[in-house]
């Protein structure tokens, strides 16, 4: 029984492209260590004095590995898996090097916005919003069933996420989520990432998807 379950897990992981897989595993491991009180979120999150004065540069990246706990964590992991898998497989054609470079650029821009504004210190949701924004560009005609059962086209997903973020977390939450979308726009412009027709979701394979509002969380301000 145990070996069969282990085999199913390995098969599931093997279907996930490498960059997405390792980010998901890193996020899951971080959450487990946090829940077991073996690791404090304050050791991971973005904090200006520690980054600049004490040169703890690792925080520029480790803050993305903390996605909260409970149901929010599960939903954030699910949506990151969905959208990042699509981007890595189809937009970046499973080119791990190019996808890593792209994510690093977006992450550093989000960090810069956060450090300048003083908003947000665990920015996993901002990165997920950036990925969701890119997914929406390539699936602009895909129908998405959002919370409470209303449907939106894929191209409106970023705006729906921003609106729901404002309703649940106020202006700070909206701004933190907006960091991700704006960062993706900037990187896309300079990297000349376009949306070829072949990837637009006229395809019947890209059917209605359900999106939960728990993807939006308040910008976490931890360890400060």
Swiss-Prot record:
The chain crosses the membrane at residues 32-52, 60-80, 100-120, 130-150, 162-182. This is Uncharacterized derlin-like protein C365.08c. GO terms for biological process: endoplasmic reticulum unfolded protein response; ERAD pathway. InterPro entries: DER1, Rhomboid-like_sf. Keywords: Endoplasmic reticulum, Membrane, Transmembrane, Transmembrane helix. GO terms for cellular component: endoplasmic reticulum; endoplasmic reticulum membrane; Hrd1p ubiquitin ligase complex. GO terms for molecular function: signal recognition particle binding. It is a multi-pass membrane protein. It is found in: Endoplasmic reticulum membrane. It comes from the Eukaryota. Belongs to the derlin family. It comes from Schizosaccharomyces pombe (strain 972 / ATCC 24843) (Fission yeast).
């Amino acid at each position: 029984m145990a070996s069969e379950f282990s085999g199913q897990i390995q098969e599931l992981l093997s279907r996930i492209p490498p960059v997405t897989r390792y980010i998901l595993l890193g996020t899951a491991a971080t959450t487990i260590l946090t829940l077991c009180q073996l690791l404090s979120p304050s050791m991971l999150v973005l904090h200006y004095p520690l980054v600049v004065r004490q040169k703890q540069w690792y925080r520029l990246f480790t803050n993305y590995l903390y996605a909260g706990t409970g149901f929010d964590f599960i939903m954030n992991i699910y949506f990151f898996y969905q959208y990042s898998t699509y981007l890595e497989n189809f937009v970046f054609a499973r080119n791990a090097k190019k996808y890593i470079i792209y994510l690093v650029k977006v992450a550093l821009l989000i960090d810069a916005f956060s450090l300048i504004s003083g908003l947000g210190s665990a920015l996993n949701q901002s990165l997920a919003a950036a990925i969701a924004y890119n997914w929406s560009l390539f699936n602009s005609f895909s129908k998405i069933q959002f919370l409470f059962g209303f449907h939106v086209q894929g191209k409106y997903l970023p705006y729906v996420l921003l609106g729901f973020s404002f309703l649940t977390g106020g202006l700070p939450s909206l701004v933190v989520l907006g960091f991700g979308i704006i960062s993706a726009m900037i990187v896309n412009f300079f990297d000349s990432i376009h949306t070829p027709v072949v990837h637009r979701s006229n395809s019947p394979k890209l059917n209605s998807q359900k999106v939960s509002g728990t993807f939006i969380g308040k910008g976490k301000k931890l360890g400060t």
